[in-house]
Regions:
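Metallo-beta-lactamase
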Residues: 69-71, 75-79, 170, 177-219
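Short, solvent-exposed loop/turn elements at domain surfaces
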Residues: 43-44, 49-54, 71-73, 81-82, ...
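Bacterial N-terminal signal peptides that target proteins for export
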Residues: 2-15
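Bacterial N-terminal signal peptides
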Residues: 13-24
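Active-site HxH/HxHxD metal-binding segment of metal-dependent hydrolases
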Residues: 87-170, 189
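Pre-active-site segment of Zn-dependent metallo-hydrolases
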Residues: 49-59, 65-99
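Acidic/histidine-rich helix-loop elements
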Residues: 44-59, 133-135, 142, 212-219
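Zn-dependent metallo-beta-lactamase
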Residues: 22-68
Length: 219
């Protein structure tokens, strides 16, 4: 069996080959999905910290296109960032975004939920992260506003509309299977792997880090 493709922290240079780092950081973020498998795409975020230029989108965002609609893996850090993600998805597919899967409790995984829920999109996460999201959502927003300023305007911490409770769950949309695997949390309590068996592809969220180290912050 071939090894699965891992999507978490692919190099930012994949989106900005040939640009000097200081130049790319000075420009506003452009959300653009690149194909990684048949019907599967990813926006590869910067591996550095949140900045006003990257609008807090220093994470990878997945897009899975099915015959019954599209699925986003994570919703971005802000309302405005979520709108950019949606616009980028429309350049890939005319399919409506049916689901947003929040892989964890970091701001850039779920604070864009409000935008998508206003469009009628269902947001899905593991119930192990519910308390963490409730307790830290406003703190995340305060931190984002300090960095992003007006780019955080319109953002309201909006909890997922559907909670998964078992360690292993399987959902299907348009004949495409999504297997959710919660193994006790990682960076946050709700961190969940999303396995696409038909694609042999794994979205790892904040469970696996590549090309960077976890932040070590005194508390």
């Amino acid at each position: 069996m071939p090894m699965p493709t891992h999507l978490h922290a692919m190099p930012a240079r994949a989106l900005a080959m040939g640009l000097a780092l200081f130049c790319s950081l000075a420009q506003a973020v452009t959300v653009e999905f690149q194909r990684v498998a048949d019907g599967v795409y990813a926006f590869v975020g910067e591996t550095g910290a949140r900045t006003a230029e990257n609008e807090g989108l220093n994470a990878n965002i997945g897009l899975v296109v099915t015959p019954a609609g599209a699925v986003l893996i994570d919703s971005g850090a802000t309302f405005q960032g979520a709108r950019q993600i949606a616009e980028a998805a429309r350049k890939v597919t005319p399919q409506p975004i049916r689901w947003v899967i929040n892989t964890g409790g970091q701001d850039h995984r779920w604070l864009g939920n409000g935008y998508f829920q206003a469009q009628g999109t269902e947001s899905i996460a593991h119930a192990a992260g519910e308390a963490d999201m409730k307790n830290r959502g406003n703190d995340h927003l305060v931190g984002l506003k300090a960095v992003l300023g007006a780019k955080a305007d319109g953002t309201v911490p909006t909890l997922p509309s559907r909670w998964l409770k078992s360690p292993d769950e399987r959902l299907e949309l348009g004949g495409v299977a999504f297997e959710f695997k919660h193994r006790g949390g990682a960076h946050t309590p709700g961190d969940t792997l999303v396995w696409l068996p038909q694609k042999n592809l794994l979205f790892t969220g904040d469970v696996v880090y590549v090309d960077r180290m976890l932040g070590v912050i005194p508390v």
